Amino acid sequence: LFNSRNKLIEFERMFSEFVDCEYVILTSSGTSALYVLLKAYGLKKGDEVIVPAYMCEKVIRLLLDMRYKVKLVDVEKETYNLSIDDLNEKISENTKAVIAVHMFGNPCRMDEISDIAHDHGAIVIEDSAQCICAEYKGKKVGSLGDSAFFSFGEGKPIITISGGAVTTNDKKIAKKAREIVSKFKQKTNGKILLKLILYYIIKNRRIYKLLYNKIQKRRMKRWDELKEVMNLDSLKQKFTDMQASIGIIQLRKLKCFNKIRYKNSMFL
């Protein structure tokens, strides 16, 4: 774990092969990855971005704090993914981007979404935070839209304490994204190590039971935080070598993890 020189390059290569996407740029979080993509595509204040009405609140908060015009589109009741019919109704020539969220591991109907978006001159960004491994018509999520972003944060299929990634087959966008990330501050491995130790302690069954109420109260406070302005500078941090080392280990074990998740889902 500590012999982590060149691990960033190795993890990017492995994840690129896994997603079957030419370019991968690692970031400090999934939110940071989306921030980088929006900047790389050159979206300006006031530009319209379409998102599903049911999705991670952090994405909405980021878009509003970057001063984009957010337009909500209904979701399908079967999958909670973007409704094709409502997208057709809501999209306009003012729409610059459509964020397609693969909710709960269910891939969106990406061919239809892309056709509609491109007909109106809009780009399609996949939110693949909850959907590593899933495929749509033989292709992995994260390689279906114009670009995509992943999260490696708490509760995700791959957890590197925090972290995220941009994936794209567009060389120009990849270059811009890498230039943006290169100017970010370097996080220290010490903070990552401390969080890793705390994770192991908290996830002990007895300790988690004692701390459960406090953890739930902290999660509920997130709704109040939505009223606050997001500190965009907090997104401008680099993914560390230590996180890359953790990511490599987790990616190698992902099939095993997914088998356990599938087995556990049978209890629901």
What positions do the PLM features span?
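Active-site region of PLP-dependent enzymes
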Residues: 132-137, 147-267
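Alpha-helical structural signal in soluble globular domains
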Residues: 14, 62, 66, 90, ...
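Hydrophobic residues in well-ordered beta-strands that form the structural core
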Residues: 51, 72, 124-126
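A short beta-strand submotif of the Rossmann-like class I SAM-dependent methyltransferase core
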Residues: 26, 51, 100
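Active-site phosphate-binding strand-loop segment of PLP-dependent enzymes
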Residues: 78-160, 165-176, 183
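Glycine-rich phosphate-binding segment of PLP-dependent enzymes
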Residues: 1-3
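Phosphate-binding glycine-rich loop
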Residues: 5-48, 57-66, 72-74, 139
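Short amphipathic alpha-helical/adjacent loop interface patches that line ligand
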Residues: 12, 53, 84, 265
